[in-house]
Amino acid sequence: MSAVHENEARRRQRLRYQIRLKAHGRPRLSVFRSGKHIYAQVIDDAAGRTLAAASSLDAGLRSALKTGADKAAAAAVGKLVAERAKEAGVTQVVFDRGAYMYHGRVKALAEAARESGLDF
């Protein structure tokens, strides 16, 4: 493994550790963004399982959205993942933006999830 990859791996581990410390047992809302779609899932790290998930590929959203890669799609995914998390009994989460800046689609997803009842 090259030095660059080792440094990236160390940084990822450090970020995951910091999120686990701040979580205090709360599930985390993890975001993945690709060029065409956006995905969000609520993960319980203690149990190692996904409690709720949503993406711009979901059938209901896909037909209603023009594209899966804009702020409107991110907001719709945020609202949907918040509704599914509340159905699973989760109201408090820790936001895990990964390496993405809190800007644009990631911010739109987070704000929509907050407005729909998730607390973070």
Swiss-Prot record:
**Keyword Kinase applies:** no
Q: Which organism is it from?
A: Acidiphilium cryptum (strain JF-5)
Q: Which UniProt keywords apply?
A: Ribonucleoprotein, Ribosomal protein, RNA-binding, rRNA-binding
Function according to Swiss-Prot or TrEMBL? This is one of the proteins that bind and probably mediate the attachment of the 5S RNA into the large ribosomal subunit, where it forms part of the central protuberance.
Biological process GO annotation list?
A: translation
Complex formation: Part of the 50S ribosomal subunit; part of the 5S rRNA/L5/L18/L25 subcomplex. Contacts the 5S and 23S rRNAs.
Please identify the protein, giving its name as recorded: Large ribosomal subunit protein uL18
- SUPFAM superfamilies for this protein: Translational machinery components
Report the domain of life of the source organism.
Bacteria
Q: Which GO terms describe its cellular component?
A: cytosolic large ribosomal subunit
Note the InterPro entries from the entry: Ribosomal_uL18_bac-type, Ribosomal_uL18_bac/euk
Q: Which family does it belong to?
A: Belongs to the universal ribosomal protein uL18 family.
Q: Does the keyword Metal-binding apply?
A: no
